Every structure is written in C-alpha cells, then in structure tokens.
C-alpha cells in the first residue's frame, strides 16, 4: 500500500515548462506544465472525452489542448473549449492535483486535496543556501520505494556494497544511535561517529588533510520518503563530535527523495551539497560522478532484490540487529498507513 495524504516530490522545478511532461505517481498518470504566467500545474493525464493522454497535446494561454479532439482544459482542470460545440457538459473536467514549488522542487499531493497543507512540506533543506554548492540528479528504479528507504536507513551495507566509494571496514560493525520522534508524521534520526578512523575513498579524494579522521553520518528521515544527510570528516581530535568544524573538514549535505511511481517502480531525486571550493567545476564533476557511482551500486542490488521479491512475495525476511534503523522507519511508515486508512492524522 502507498501513503497518499502526504507531499511527494514530482520533479525539479526546472523539469516543468510550457511543454507537457508526463509522469506517473502512485499508479496515477499525471501531466505537468506551466501556464502562461509561469505557474506550475499538475492535472490527470487523461482527457475525460476519449481518455487520450493530455501530455500529447499542447499548452496554450487558456490551458492544455488535447491533441485528439481539441478540447482545452484550464489550470483547475475544467474544460473551457470544445471545438464545434458551444455548450460544455458539466462533467467535462479532469482532476487537478495540488502542486507547490519550493526549494527548487515541485511537491505534489496525490491524496484528498482538502488535507493538502503546504506548511507540512519539509522545510529544512539546503537547496539554494548561498554558502552551499548544490547539484541535483535523478535515477529511475525498477523497485518499490520502500526497498530504497530500507537501504538508506541501513549503514552496515556500506562496507559491502560500497567498498571503494562510501564504505570502510568499520561501517559493518559500528552501532548507530537511533532517535524516533512520533510527533506529527514522525521523524527518525540515526547518528554514527567513527572516531580516529580511515576516511572513505569519496572523502579522501577531496580532503585537504591526511591521516585519521573523526567521521560523522547524521541522517534525518521524514516519512514516507525523504532523507536528509549530514556527513563529513575532520582531522582526529579537532572537536568534531562536540560540534566544531575546522576549516579543513570535509562537509557534505545530501537530500534523497523517493516518490513511488508504481508498486514496483520509483522516482529518485537527490541533491548533493558541499560548503568548500564552491566554484571548482572540476571538483564538482568529480564529486558528482562519485555519488552517481555509489547510487548505481545501490540500484544494482535493490533492483535484483525486487526481482526476487516479485517472484516469491510471501517469502519472509529474517531481521538481524543491524536492521534497527530500517525497522524503525518501517514502523513509522506503517503508522502513517494505519492513520490514513482510519481517516485520522497521526
């Protein structure tokens, strides 16, 4: 089951233009476009006349015109023109989905529009902060979004799936501190400190110091599918665990966002930020490619996992102690689903 009464990312703000864009969210076909005044709109991608996709049409000043028989639908989804017919039937309309543009992202609400409150959109992102250089990307997964969330909340796989990028030997054994906040829709914070440890290859490749480091991974997950990461490495003994960040420390901020496409496919947007050498384009490309390589390592494993789950959906997974973080995440997600099915907010 998929949570509907929540804000999902529908894309980067730059994805939406005067050219119709077809996407699927939570098994629903949606068309995204901008009106003549630049306002982003999300409508059901299905003309109510003969069920042709509106995304094959054209955006005009009055709205989007279906290419099959020429009906025009405005930004609210109402039909405002039928070629050759003056009277418009009262049922000639398509569903409009609430859509908000914030932090350089498009946020869509697929559930009950009466419950869509933009104030509920996660606000603690680094996108657009002048002291951070942010670069974004997109990956399409042939896998259920929960498998991606499980992977992100699981630190121990770093040693095995990412031995040459993000992982170190200590990643497999160090236990995290897990804090669960059940106010509102909930939040999960997972913290790990690696003191006097080796840096990962990704950090080592950009660090301006050598030797051992005090490394941190602080993850904040907001259900159903948004993860903010604060990661970095500082020279050992320079006060990083107490909050001090010396100038030579390597600091990254990362946002990972998943939106279910179907039960077995997912959208994945990410924003990678750093606060050093902001104008170094060669370094930007180096870091970006390193992140992409690590994500492809994850995707290979997760998509293979989905294939097996699709073949034997009733085969149980046997939990181990290292699953504590992802199990807490699943608990919060189940809580949202139960609240939605019961018709009350958590």
Curated annotation (Swiss-Prot):
UniProt record, GO biological process: catabolic process
Residue stretches making up the Rieske domain: 7-108
Ranges in a coiled coil: none
Alphabetized GO MF terms: 2 iron, 2 sulfur cluster binding; metal ion binding; toluene-sulfonate methyl-monooxygenase activity
Names of required cofactors: [2Fe-2S] cluster
Domain of life of the source: Bacteria
Entries under InterPro entries matching the protein: Cholesterol_7-desaturase (IPR050584), Rieske_2Fe-2S (IPR017941), Rieske_2Fe-2S_sf (IPR036922), VanA_C_cat (IPR044043)
Cofactor note: Binds 1 [2Fe-2S] cluster per subunit.
TM regions (residue ranges): none
Its EC number(s): 1.14.14.-
Name of protein: Putative toluene-4-sulfonate monooxygenase system iron-sulfur subunit TsaM2
Lineage: Bacteria, Pseudomonadati, Pseudomonadota, Betaproteobacteria, Burkholderiales
């Amino acid at each position: 089951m998929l949570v509907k009464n929540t804000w999902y990312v529908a894309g980067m703000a730059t994805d939406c233009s005067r050219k119709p864009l077809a996407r699927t969210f939570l098994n629903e076909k949606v068309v995204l476009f901008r009106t003549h005044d630049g306002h982003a709109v999300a409508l059901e991608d299905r003309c109510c006349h003969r069920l042709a996709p509106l995304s094959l049409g054209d955006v005009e000043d009055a709205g989007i015109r279906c290419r099959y028989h020429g009906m025009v639908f405005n930004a609210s989804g109402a039909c405002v023109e039928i070629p050759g017919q003056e009277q418009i039937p009262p049922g000639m309309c398509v569903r409009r989905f609430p859509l908000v543009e914030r932090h350089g992202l498009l946020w869509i609400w697929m559930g009950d529009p009466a419950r869509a409150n933009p104030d509920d959109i996660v606000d603690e992102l680094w996108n657009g902060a002048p002291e951070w250089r942010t670069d974004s990307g997109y990956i399409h997964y042939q896998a259920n979004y929960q498998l991606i969330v499980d992977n992100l909340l699981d630190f121990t796989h770093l040693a095995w799936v990412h031995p040459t990028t993000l992982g170190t030997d200590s990643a497999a054994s160090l236990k995290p501190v897990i804090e669960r906040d059940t106010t509102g829709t909930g939040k999960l914070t997972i913290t790990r400190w690696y003191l006097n440890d080796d840096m990962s290859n990704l950090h080592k490749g950009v660090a301006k110091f050598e030797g051992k480091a005090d490394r941190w991974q602080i993850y904040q997950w907001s259900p159903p599918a948004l993860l903010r990461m604060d990661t970095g490495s500082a020279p050992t003994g320079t006060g990083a665990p107490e909050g001090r960040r010396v100038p030579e420390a390597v600091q990254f901020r990362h946002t990972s966002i998943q939106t279910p496409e179907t039960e077995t496919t997912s959208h994945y947007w990410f924003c990678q930020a750093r606060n050093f050498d902001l104008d170094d384009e060669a370094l930007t490309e180096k870091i970006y490619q390193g992140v992409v390589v690590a994500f492809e390592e994850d995707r290979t494993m997760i998509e293979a996992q989905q294939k097996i789950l699709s073949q034997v959906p009733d085969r149980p997974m046997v939990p181990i102690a290292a699953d504590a973080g992802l199990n807490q995440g699943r608990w919060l997600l189940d809580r949202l689903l139960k609240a939605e099915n019961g018709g009350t907010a958590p």
